[in-house]
């Protein structure tokens, strides 16, 4: 199993609207083959910071998701939020192997 984390920080626009979009996109991803779960996290002290945590059976399942129309649809829904700006230096995507 692998875990993918994706972290961003909103610098303009409505972070609450982004939180709603994130909640709505979960159904686009968690039903795909190989997806074991999705969590959307919002930092307690810095509410403009978000982290998406996805769990996949293996790297092939994650790669297939990135090529799936659901990947583009989920990211497009976020990009379409009026006035939303994401700090490009805050975007961090990391992969982890699950050891236990």
Regions found by a protein language model. Give the residues of each.
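Short, flexible segments with low predicted structural confidence
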Residues: 1-2, 17, 33-35
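Short, surface-exposed ligand-recognition loops at beta-strand->loop->(often short) alpha-helix junctions
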Residues: 9-18
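Short, solvent-exposed amphipathic helices
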Residues: 21-24
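Short, well-ordered beta-strand segments in beta-rich or mixed alpha/beta enzyme
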Residues: 2-8, 39-66
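Short acidic/polar alpha-helix capping motifs at helix-coil junctions
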Residues: 2-4, 15, 26
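An amphipathic, aromatic/His-enriched active-site/gating alpha helix that lines ligand/cofactor pockets
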Residues: 27-36, 55-90
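Glycine-rich beta-strand-turn "strand-cap" elements at beta-sheet edges
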Residues: 2, 39-48, 76-100
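A generic structural signal for ordered secondary structure
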Residues: 10, 29-32, 95
């Amino acid at each position: 199993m692998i875990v993918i984390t994706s972290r961003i920080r909103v610098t303009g626009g409505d972070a609450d609207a982004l939180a709603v979009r994130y909640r709505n996109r979960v159904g686009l991803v968690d039903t795909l083959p190989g997806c074991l779960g999705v969590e959307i996290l919002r930092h307690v002290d810095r509410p403009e910071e978000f982290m998406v945590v996805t769990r996949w059976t293996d790297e092939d399942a994650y790669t297939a998701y990135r090529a799936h129309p659901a990947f583009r649809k989920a990211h497009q829904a976020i990009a379409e939020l009026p006035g939303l700006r994401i700090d490009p230096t805050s975007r961090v995507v990391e992969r982890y192997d699950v050891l236990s």
